[in-house]
Amino acid sequence: MIQLDSPRSVSSFLQRLGRTGRRAGSVRNALFLATDNDTLLRAAGLLHLWGTGFVEPVVPPPSPRHIAAQQLLALALQEGRFARASWHEWWAGSHVMDGADEVLDYLVEQEFLAADGPWLFIGPRAEKEFGRRHFLELLSTFIADLEMKVIEGRREIGSIAPLSLTAQVIESRKPLLLAGRAWTVESIDWDRRVVAVREDLTKGRVRWGSEPMPESFEMVRARRDVLLGADPPVRLSQRAVARLAEVRTLRRDQVVEDGLVMDRSEKLSVLWAFGGLKAHATLLAALPDEVSESATADNETIRFDLHFEADLLDGLSLEGVLPAIAPQAVDGLKFSVALPRGVAAATLGERFVDRLGAGRLTRAQVQVE
C-alpha cells in the first residue's frame, strides 16, 4: 500500500493496511510518501500513535435528534399512521429515541405530522420538505461527516469543518487559513456545503499550517510527541530522518516537555496547545465572549488577541459548554428542518465538543515566550 501524505486517523490507516498481504507468501506493507514538512510530521505522528497500540474507539454521534425526527416520519410513512400514545413500542428503548417526545411535539406543531384523534400520519409540511421522488430522502439515514468544500472560482482548495467558519471569518474580518494560505470568504452555500473564497494576498503564505478538519486530541498530541523527540517504530529513509530533524529544529520553540507554549508577537498571542480543533473550540466556548469572539483555532493552535492572559485558562469550567457553530451551519445537518432551530444547533454542537481534551489543556502549565 502506497500512502501519499497521511490519513487523519489510526483506524483509517489500519483499514488501508488490512487490504495488503492477503496473498499466500505476502506480508502486510505500507509506504508513506510525504510531500512537505507538515505532512511528514503528520505521518510520523500517526505512526507513532499506531506504535503505542492506540486505535480510535467507535463512538456513535451523541444526541441524534435529527435521526429521531426521521424515524418518526418514516414510521408514519411505513404504517400509514401510528398511535401517539404508544410510539415508544416501535424502538424498544433505543437510545436514538431518547428525548424524542420533544421532537414529536415539534413535528405535530409544524404539521410534519398531522393528527386525527389519537393517530398521527404524514402531514403537509413533510410532503413539501421530503415528498420528492416518493420520499426517497426520508428513507435513507446514511449521513456523512459535515464538511464544507472550499473553492476559488472553479478550483477546489480543500475541505473544512463548520468549526472553522467563525463569525469573524464569515464576515471577512479574519481570513480562513487553508492549504498554507489565507483566504477571504466571499459566499457560503450551506445547502450545497460550498464556501467560495479569494486569496488574501496581503497575508502571504501561512508559515505553520494545520489540517482544517478536526483531528483527535490523541492524534495531534502524537505530533507534539514527535516534535519532542519520539520516533515512529518504522523504518525511515535517510531523507525522512534528515527532514524530521530539520522540522524539530524549526519548531522547537512551539513545544516544551511539561506544558504549553504561548508565543506573543506584535499583533497576537498564539497558544501552541496541540489539543485538536474540537478541544480548542470547546475551550473557547468556556471563555468570556470578549475573549472568544476575537480568537480563532485549528488543530494545533489557538490564536488570541495580543493581551490575552493565560491565567484565564486555570480552573476554567467546561460543564455544559458547546463549541460555537455558525447558525447557518444547521442547514447542512440532514433532517434539521424537522427540528426546532435551537435543538438542531445543539445537536450539531454536541458533535464537535471535546471536554476531556479541553480539560487537559486547562490543567497544563503555560510558558510565555
Identify the meaning behind each predicted range.
Residues 120, 193-198, 293-314:
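A generic structural motif
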Residues 54-171, 175-182, 187-188, 264-273, ...:
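C-terminal accessory/connector segments of nucleic-acid motor ATPases
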Residues 6-61:
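Conserved segment of the helicase C-terminal RecA-like domain
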Residues 170, 243-251, 272-292:
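Short amphipathic alpha-helix segments
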Residues 111-115, 257-260, 288-297:
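Short secondary-structure junctions
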Residues 1:
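Hydrophobic beta-strand segment of the Class I
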Residues 32-35, 45, 152, 180, ...:
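Flexible glycine-/small-residue-rich
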Residues 52, 64, 133, 145, ...:
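Terminal, basic amphipathic appendages of nucleotide-handling enzymes
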